[in-house]
Structures are given as C-alpha cells and as structure tokens.
Amino acid sequence: MFIVSDGTGITAETFSHSILAQFEMRFRKVRMPFVDTPEKAHIAVGKINEAFHNEGVPPIVFTTLVNQEANKALRRAKAMILDMFQTFIEPLEKELGLKSTHAIGRFHQNADTEAYKNRIEAINFSLAHDDGQSHKNLEEADVILVGVSRSGKTPTSLYLAMQYGLKAANYPLIPDDFERGRLPSALYAFKPKIFGLSIDPQRLTEIRNERRPGSKYAALENCRYEVNEAEAMMRREGIKWLSSTHKSIEEIATTILQEIKVDRDNY
C-alpha cells in the first residue's frame, strides 16, 4: 500500500487508516510525501510498478495530488488508485458552483494562524501540567484528567492538545488521596472541568510490570485496590469517568469532549 501526496501525506494516511481498518488484513505501508512535480510522480510510478512486479498484485495507492500533470503521471502506475481529491473535491465543485483553489498543502499551511498558536500553547500547557507537576494556572485548563498512574492520562492529554488545541492537565490519584477519601484541595475549584480515567486492574498490572516488574506498585492486589478506591472516589465526587481498557486514545478524547461540553477545534 502506497501513500502518495504532494504535502506531508498526513491527510491521505489518516484516510487510509480509516478505510483499511475495516479489513482484517495487514498491509505493508510505503509513504511518499512531497510528490509535487510530474518528475517526482514518474519516480513514484517506478517504485509502485516495481512493487507490482515483485509481488504480482496491483498495490493500493492512496493519493492527494493537486498538481494535475503529476496526477496524470501517477495514473500510469499498475495499481489501484484511490484519489481523495477526485472523489470528494470534484463533486463539491459541482454542487457548490465553485472551483477549488488546488493549492498544495492548503490544509496544513497554518503556521501563522491563531489556531496553530493555540495548539502550541495547549501542548506546552499540557506538558507543564502533566502528572500533577504544577497546579499553577489551572484556571486556564479546558479539562483536568484524574485517575490512577498508567491509566492513559498523559497520552490523552497530549492528544487533546495536539488534535484540538485544548489545554489538558492531568493529576494522578495516589494512596494519600485514597486515605483522605477526597480529591486534592487544589482541584476542587475546577471540579466542572475534571474527568476521570479508570482501567481494568489486570491490564494495569501488565502495564506497570513493564515499567517496574515485581514491585508492589505493579502487584495485581495493589492495582485492584487503587482502581477500586479511585472509582469509589469519582462516584462520591460526582465526577464523570470511563474505563480506558479497551478504548483508543481517539475514542477516549471524543467521549471527553462530549461529556465536558468543550466546543473547540484548532486542528
């Protein structure tokens, strides 16, 4: 499977993941970004045809080429071509009565926009407020994730920052919090922004044993205790939460956005 783009290829790759995930089959992926001239397209065709001759089956090619000459050249490849622009842009041009700009990399040319700056600020905020490192400026947070250690708070926080420009802090619930039976006092003022993550104890012990094998921290009995205490605390405090055990980061983030009613998209 080839991903051919005149830009970074992020759009085509994301689309290909969504489509191919519907098939229980593994694909060998070849990325070919910045194919923005007919000459580069000819080189791409050569590599695609080589794969065809070596493997005996036409490769699948996901493409987002704006340059019409490059597009024509690519279509000489012995492959199944899935052209996102032709599939979606041409019908839209007809429906809207407008011609598209056909600008290369238009979707990602946002380095000077306010949205891009917001995303960078959000990433910096999430890094500074990872794992309870700082309680400073929590009023700026769009969401504050809580949960036991290794329940998925950090990757979810960073995904929310990078994908949606959300300032996401996260705080680990620890034995001291369980003994008190309540959230840390620093978080109470921001309770409407808090969302909890939990995880199956068996899965948690597997993850923790990769980090600290044989420790009390990773023991199944301790993981059960922490998860039970954290879930009980979130129920008492009226905090919405979900189990991250069988959910992707994308699914977790989407649920959080729905539950805390954040309407912001800086992607």
Swiss-Prot record:
Signal peptide: none annotated. It holds the Pfam family Kinase-PPPase. ADP binds at G147, V148, S149, R150, S151, G152, K153, T154. It comes from the Bacteria. The keyword Nucleotide-binding applies. It catalyses: [pyruvate, water dikinase] + ADP = [pyruvate, water dikinase]-phosphate + AMP + H(+); [pyruvate, water dikinase]-phosphate + phosphate + H(+) = [pyruvate, water dikinase] + diphosphate. Its EC number is 2.7.11.33, 2.7.4.28. One of its GO terms (molecular function) is phosphotransferase activity, phosphate group as acceptor. InterPro entries: Kinase-pyrophosphorylase, PSRP. It is an enzyme of class 2 (transferase). Keywords: Kinase, Nucleotide-binding, Serine/threonine-protein kinase, Transferase. Belongs to the pyruvate, phosphate/water dikinase regulatory protein family. PSRP subfamily. Bifunctional serine/threonine kinase and phosphorylase involved in the regulation of the phosphoenolpyruvate synthase (PEPS) by catalyzing its phosphorylation/dephosphorylation. PANTHER family: PYRUVATE, PHOSPHATE DIKINASE REGULATORY PROTEIN 1, CHLOROPLASTIC. This is Putative phosphoenolpyruvate synthase regulatory protein.
